[in-house]
From Swiss-Prot:
Origin species: Arabidopsis thaliana (Mouse-ear cress)
Family: Belongs to the NFYC/HAP5 subunit family.
A cellular component term, taken from the record's GO annotations: CCAAT-binding factor complex
Name the record gives this protein: Nuclear transcription factor Y subunit C-2
Top-level taxonomic group: Eukaryota
Amino acid sequence: MEQSEEGQQQQQQGVMDYVPPHAYQSGPVNAASHMAFQQAHHFHHHHQQQQQQQLQMFWANQMQEIEHTTDFKNHTLPLARIKKIMKADEDVRMISAEAPVIFAKACEMFILELTLRAWIHTEENKRRTLQKNDIAAAISRTDVFDFLVDIIPRDELKEEGLGVTKGTIPSVVGSPPYYYLQQQGMMQHWPQEQHPDES
C-alpha cells in the first residue's frame, strides 16, 4: 500500500516538476528572445509616450483656442440643432443664448478627442482609413468614454484584437486631466483617476 502511494506521489511530482527542455536554455537563443522582448517593450513604451504627447498637445491647443476665442458667432456645429436636442428634455423650459454656444464647443471637443484616439488605433493597425472599430477601440480604452460602451456593437469590439480591455492596457502617468476647477485665475488639474471631491 505504501509503495502505491509513493508511486502516485512520484507520478504527481513528476508531472508538476516537468519543465520543457528549452525553458532554461542559455546562450544565443534565450539572449536573442530576451533582446527581442526588450526591444518590443521599449518600442511599445515609446509609442505610448508619443500617443500621450499627442493627447497633451491636443488639449493644450484646445485650451489655447478657447482662451483666445473672440468670435462667438461662427460655430462648427449648428446651434439650432443643439438647442432642439436640449429642449428634448421636458424639464428644460428656457435656454439662454450662451448655453448652445458652450454645448457646441463641448461637442466639437468631444468629437475631436474621440477622433484623435480612434486615429491612434488606426495607425497602430497600419491603416490610413479610420473605421468604426477604431472608434470602438478608442471608447473601450478610455475611462471617460465608458458611457458609450453600451452603444458599441459587440462585434466591433471583437475585430482586430479589440478583446484587449482597458484593464489590461497599462495606464500612462500624466494622462490628460478631465476635472478642472477655476480658482483665482489659475487652472488646477486633477489626474483622471482622482476627483477633486476625493482629495
